[in-house]
Amino acid sequence: MTDKLTSLRQVTTVVADTGDIAAMKLYQPQDATTNPSLILNAAQIPEYRKLIDEAIAWAREQSSDRKQQVVDATDKLAVNIGLEILKLIPGRISTEVDARLSYDTEASVAKAKHLIKLYNDAGISNERILIKLASTWQGICAAEQLEKEGINCNLTLLFSFAQARACAEAGVFLISPFVGRILDWYKANGDKKEFAPHEDPGVVSVSEIYDYYKEHGYETVVMGASFRNVGEILELAGCDRLTIAPALLKELSESEGEVVRKLSYVGDVKVRPARMTEAEFYWQHNQDPMAIDKLADGIRKFAIDQEKLEKMIADLL
């Protein structure tokens, strides 16, 4: 009898949502995703201390300004962790742009190019990297510019259909619609506290995005993210990719059974609608109170963890 993780891999590319190298060795994902929170957690692992020390030493060589050293060391640490992970996976690493730049297109592009250069200088080609950006209008515009320059992007903190549509129209490589955080919001703000997997609002959101992309022939990859339970994952079997935390990878690997494909599209490709304007994007996105709350909340949380990481680095400088 096969286990569910092995079975899931037959219909979906499995990605590890972690910065933990031990988890990569154990579950052997195709790709891996990191974010400021995961980098902060990874930085606490004793085996990573040498990566922190190396990042700090490198930053000292780049500038004598302490503030700049902190920024440089934080960027280099994220890349160092990415480099270690790339030794263990055949595919791509996603590394995130500072969430505090989420409303600044030019600064996001500049930071993305800086991260790419750090990877390139370490011998890693663009084909193995995804730059993560928040799915704000400004982040989507930054991604469109980067894609034209051969830098593929992963648009994260995606909660609304408007965000998904704008990403497809901008030609971004991949989106990460969040499942669990959508469920969290509905549990916290509605009367219903329990949802069957097929009616889970996060699952419904990703399913609708997947269908829309396939119906209209968009090549943007849909990678479901932020899962709260195995039921959500199994309900999205067949999605292009799913990025899954180690605890849920473990649960899947220890469960026997065949996974049934739930998402697929067979049919004619429909004519795409005219491209959204910025005004239309904001109007449609702002019709969704959950998406407004969770996008802002996600940016705040990533920014807080980025600041914690910078403080940790500053204390070591």
Curated annotation (Swiss-Prot):
Q: Which InterPro entries match?
A: Aldolase_TIM (IPR013785), TAL/FSA (IPR001585), Transaldolase_1 (IPR004730), Transaldolase_AS (IPR018225)
Keyword Cytoplasm attached: yes
> Where in or outside the cell is it found?
Cytoplasm
Which residues catalyse the reaction? 132
Keywords noted in UniProt? Cytoplasm, Pentose shunt, Schiff base, Transferase
What are the GO MF terms of this UniProt record? transaldolase activity
Primary site of residence: cytoplasm
- Keyword presence, Transferase: yes
Q: Name one GO biological process term.
A: pentose-phosphate shunt
Catalytic activity annotation: D-sedoheptulose 7-phosphate + D-glyceraldehyde 3-phosphate = D-erythrose 4-phosphate + beta-D-fructose 6-phosphate
Residue ranges of the TM segments: none
**Which SUPFAM superfamilies does the record cross-reference, listed alphabetically?**
Aldolase
Say which enzyme class the record assigns: transferase
EC annotation from Swiss-Prot or TrEMBL? 2.2.1.2
Q: Which domain of life is it from?
A: Bacteria
Q: Which Pfam families does this entry report, sorted A to Z?
A: TAL_FSA (PF00923)
Among the entry's GO cellular component annotations, what is one?
cytosol
Subunit details: Homodimer.
What the protein does comes down to: Transaldolase is important for the balance of metabolites in the pentose-phosphate pathway.
The family note in this entry says: Belongs to the transaldolase family. Type 1 subfamily.
What is the name of the protein in this document?
Transaldolase 2
